[in-house]
């Protein structure tokens, strides 16, 4: 029983403004929609159901019915979902604007209640006040919201969400923003609304209000790769495959500084209708480049590593070894379709082998060495502590020699031309014969930073940017990378 959805259905019949604002895909004729994947709350109609991906941000936050309108909480167009979305910092004045919007769209007074009661009492069997017939009158005004942290912004999507105890498979978490407002003032608003209802309905209204206004906020979730759909890109493993984003916009671009003021637009109904009549869509092609996707890719690579290669004498690079059960890697995995990962894997393994061979370790492919367990971690550059520990364990395994208080290892084994170029690039134009710990870290990190410079990388994909940010980046031609030309981050 989706209270918010029912309220939108009944209240949109009140006037022209409501018919425009409260139009939901969930209340309209169903159209073919993408397959649903996760359980959670649709941000558009607030019902708990199976969710599909949003074409505006690639997150799973819309049901298959509401997906037909392609609404995203990051849109510029001030539709109902966008007007219910606030950014930190939320002030008391912002909340007043939200509550005023609720009162405007979902009023409760004696005249309106009688109108709804008369429309329900069509037959004698409907003389009772059954909750399912009056569900739309039982939506209290609360500061219940779903929250998500994207880059440096925290978003709050206010609404009335039923079934809070159900399983949540999305990155959005429930938060109670009552502490940002006056508890007694909110109580007074709801008691006034409730006073116009029949006694039986008052009891249910009060129960719903207190359960949705006095709950404890839950801890924020960390985003993961699985929270984003692959459906917006042709090939998730190709660096040249872009994510296709659709955003709803209006002719009068609203500054992000005024983000929380969107809900105040409906105060002037004529102006709001005029703004909505100027709505249009903007399409963007954006890069996949972000830390979240990078961590995921390197996580797969680290699980596929064949560390025995660093003791081998194979003439071919690490990914091209055949007929060796200790060194041959399964290169049929989709992750190897990314040429950047192939280059990084081959170069890192070649450099480590050169260090091992240079420092007197006369092993073989079949050797079982203690250092093997640290080799996969050398690709987890986003996990700084783990990566540093792996480099240090490798360096110590090479039995460095102390020279004037600094430990050094040799580098006199042949490396391929690409590795040689990277070493020279990071070591003042020459290939040194000895390396200390910092030199080793510098070279190993440079091999990864050449293609995935995580030091200057967004945490989440650009699909989570606001429409204004996308527009600005597009003007600077910074939405896509030059990987189709095989130009690295450094180049």
Curated annotation (Swiss-Prot):
Residues 1-81 are annotated as: RNA-binding. It holds the Pfam family Rota_NS53. GO terms for molecular function: metal ion binding; RNA binding. The keyword RNA-binding applies. Residues 82-176 are annotated as: Important for cytoskeleton localization. Residues 320-491 are annotated as: Interaction with host IRF3. It is found in: Host cytoplasm, Host cytoskeleton. Plays a role in the inhibition of host innate immunity by inducing the degradation of key host factors required to activate interferon production such as IRF3, IRF5 or IRF7. Associates with components of cullin RING ligases (CRLs) including CUL1 or CUL3, which are essential multisubunit ubiquitination complexes, to modulate their activities. This is Non-structural protein 1. It comes from Rotavirus A (strain RVA/Cow/United States/WC3/1981/G6P7[5]). The lineage of its organism: Viruses, Riboviria, Orthornavirae, Duplornaviricota, Resentoviricetes.
């Amino acid at each position: 029983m989706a209270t918010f959805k029912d309220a939108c259905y009944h209240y949109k019949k009140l006037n022209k403004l409501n018919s425009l604002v409260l139009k939901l895909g969930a209340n309209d004729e169903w159209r073919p929609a993408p397959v649903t994947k996760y359980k959670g709350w649709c941000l558009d109609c607030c019902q708990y159901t199976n969710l599909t991906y949003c074409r505006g941000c690639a997150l799973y936050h819309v049901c298959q019915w509401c997906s037909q309108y392609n609404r995203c909480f990051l849109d510029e167009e001030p539709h109902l979902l966008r007007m219910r979305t606030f950014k930190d910092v939320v002030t008391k004045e912002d909340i007043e604007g939200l509550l005023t919007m609720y009162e405007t769209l979902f009023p409760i007074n004696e005249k309106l209640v009688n109108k709804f009661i008369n429309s329900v009492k069509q037959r004698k069997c409907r003389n009772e006040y059954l909750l399912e017939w009056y569900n739309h009158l039982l939506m209290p005004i609360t500061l219940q919201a779903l929250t998500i942290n994207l880059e440096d912004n925290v978003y709050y999507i206010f609404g009335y969400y039923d079934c809070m105890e159900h399983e949540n498979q999305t990155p959005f978490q429930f938060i109670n923003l009552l502490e940002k407002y006056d508890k007694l003032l909110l109580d007074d608003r709801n008691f006034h609304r409730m006073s116009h209802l029949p006694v039986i309905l008052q009891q249910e209204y009060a129960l719903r209000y207190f359960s949705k206004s006095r709950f404890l906020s839950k801890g924020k979730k960390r985003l993961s790769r699985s929270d984003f759909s692959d459906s917006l890109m042709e090939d998730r493993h190709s660096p040249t495959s872009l994510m296709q984003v659709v955003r709803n916009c209006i002719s009068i671009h609203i500054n992000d500084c005024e983000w929380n003021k969107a809900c105040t637009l409906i105060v002037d109904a004529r102006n709001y209708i005029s703004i909505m009549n100027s709505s249009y869509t903007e399409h963007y092609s954006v890069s996949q480049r972000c830390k979240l996707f990078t961590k995921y890719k390197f996580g797969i690579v680290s699980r596929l590593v064949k560390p025995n290669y660093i003791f081998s004498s194979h003439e071919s690079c690490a990914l091209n070894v055949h007929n060796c059960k200790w060194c041959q890697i399964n290169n049929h995995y989709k992750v190897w379709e990314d040429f950047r990962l192939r280059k990084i894997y081959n170069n890192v393994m070649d450099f480590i082998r050169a260090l091992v061979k240079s420092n007197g370790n006369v092993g073989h492919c079949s050797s079982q060495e203690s250092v093997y367990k640290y080799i996969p971690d050398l690709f987890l550059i986003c996990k700084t502590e783990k990566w540093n520990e792996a480099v240090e364990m490798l360096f110590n395994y090479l039995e460095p020699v102390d020279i004037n208080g600094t430990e050094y290892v040799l580098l006199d084994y042949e490396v391929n031309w690409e590795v040689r170029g990277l070493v020279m690039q990071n070591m003042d134009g020459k290939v040194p014969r000895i390396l200390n710990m910092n030199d080793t870290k510098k070279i190993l990190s440079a091999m990864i930073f050449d293609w995935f410079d995580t030091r200057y990388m967004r945490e989440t994909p650009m699909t989570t940017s606001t429409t204004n940010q996308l527009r600005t980046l597009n003007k600077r031609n910074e939405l896509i990378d030059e990987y189709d030309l095989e130009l690295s981050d450094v180049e």
